[in-house]
Amino acid sequence: MINPQPDEKELLKTILEPLLGDFEHWFSRSCQLLESQRLVFFTPEQQQELLDRVRQARDEVKCTKLMFQATGEQVGVEFSVLVPWHNLVTECWQVAQRHRQMQAAR
């Protein structure tokens, strides 16, 4: 029995498209939190710095997504680009979790 391998374009669409969507989703949610709430465990400067980094990453993801679509889903993304986005999403999850814990403790 022949096991057909997906071609590169199909593989990119299957993996990269939802991954970029996830990054876009979590960066947007993080922006909403950082813009709408004063996080007492940060100085205003720290909160603004995180918000600036999230906005920058969100813009990079949007640009990457547009390039991916404009090239007919034939362009990939370097792992060295994805890792910082992943690390930033993880940092944002930790901030959101800490915020929820502090809200629950009130």
Swiss-Prot record:
InterPro entries cross-referenced by the UniProt entry: DUF2605 (IPR019728)
Record Pfam families: DUF2605
Record-given protein name: Uncharacterized protein slr0270
